[in-house]
Amino acid sequence: MKCPFCAFADSKVVDSRPDKGGSTIRRRRECESCGKRFTTHERVEEILPLVIKKDGRREPFDRMKLVAGIQKACEKRPVSVETIERLVDRLEIQMQESGEKEIPSKSLGEWVMAELHSIDQVAYVRFASVYRSFKDITEFMSELQDLLKK
């Protein structure tokens, strides 16, 4: 692992342990050149399906892109980063278990909205407003009315 301080290519692992959820390994490393210590988080690289975009393009699933979108919807809301990470972890597990090679972005968006609905309704409406691309206030109000009925 390349040292973030001096860019030396080799380091040794000083300590290694699973994180709280068990999905990643936290490692403390020491640079063999400058001696400084740094932390890395490692996770198994999983093979996830391609995402079929609205325009028909296909691209690899990008966890960070999804996390960023959800974080934007949850901005200034009482939703922790850990809650968002667990939400995306559940989605990745669901995608792997489906065995599908491709998944429409619409399916991902609907799943995220269902999860956000139970976590924070304001974040749900924010995510829905971007995901569903409301054309006018009427569509937005319709979504709010549906939310109030539930």
Curated annotation (Swiss-Prot):
Keywords, sorted A to Z: ATP-binding, DNA-binding, Metal-binding, Nucleotide-binding, Repressor, Transcription, Transcription regulation, Zinc, Zinc-finger
The protein's required cofactors: Zn(2+)
Signal peptide interval: none
Superkingdom assignment: Bacteria
Biological process (GO), any one: negative regulation of DNA-templated transcription
InterPro entries: ATP-cone_dom (IPR005144), NrdR-like_N (IPR055173), RNR_NrdR-like (IPR003796)
PANTHER family, A to Z: TRANSCRIPTIONAL REPRESSOR NRDR
Protein name from the UniProt record: Transcriptional repressor NrdR
Protein species of origin: Geotalea uraniireducens (strain Rf4) (Geobacter uraniireducens)
Species lineage: Bacteria, Pseudomonadati, Thermodesulfobacteriota, Desulfuromonadia, Geobacterales
Gene that produces this protein: nrdR
